[in-house]
From Swiss-Prot:
Coiled coil: none annotated. It comes from Chlorobaculum tepidum (strain ATCC 49652 / DSM 12025 / NBRC 103806 / TLS) (Chlorobium tepidum). Belongs to the universal ribosomal protein uL14 family. Pfam families: Ribosomal_L14. Binds to 23S rRNA. Forms part of two intersubunit bridges in the 70S ribosome. One of its GO terms (molecular function) is large ribosomal subunit rRNA binding. This is Large ribosomal subunit protein uL14. Keywords: Ribonucleoprotein, Ribosomal protein, RNA-binding, rRNA-binding. GO terms for cellular component: cytosolic large ribosomal subunit. Part of the 50S ribosomal subunit. Forms a cluster with proteins L3 and L19. In the 70S ribosome, L14 and L19 interact and together make contacts with the 16S rRNA in bridges B5 and B8. The gene is rplN. One of its GO terms (biological process) is translation.
Amino acid sequence: MIQKETNLVVADNSGAKKVRCIHVFGGTGRRYAALGDQIMVSVKAAVPGGVVKKKDVCKAVVVRCVKEQKRKDGSYIRFDENAVVLLNAQGEPRGTRIFGPVARELRDKRYMKIVSLAPEVL
C-alpha cells in the first residue's frame, strides 16, 4: 500500500533514483495505491544529466509493492521494495529501460509498454 509521504525507488532510466508520493489518483477520499495504480510523485534524488531533475513533480505507476496483493486465482504477490515507473503526459514511460521484475497486474491495467520493456513479469 502506497500513501502520501511514502518513499519509493524508481525502476527506470529516466534519471530519478528516489521519489516521494504526494498524491494518490482515483477520487478525493482515496488513501492507498496498489499495483498498477497511478500516483503523483516528487523527485528526491536524481543522477546528473538525467531527463528528470530533483524537485520535479510527475506522474508514476506502481510496479512493485511490499504489501501483498491477492490475485483472482487465490495466490498472493509481494515484492521486497516499493517501486514506480515515471510517466509522461500521455501515460507512457519516460525512460527507455525498466529494471527488475514488474507485476502481471500492469497488463490488466493496459500498461503494455511497461510490460514489454520489463525483463520479467511475475
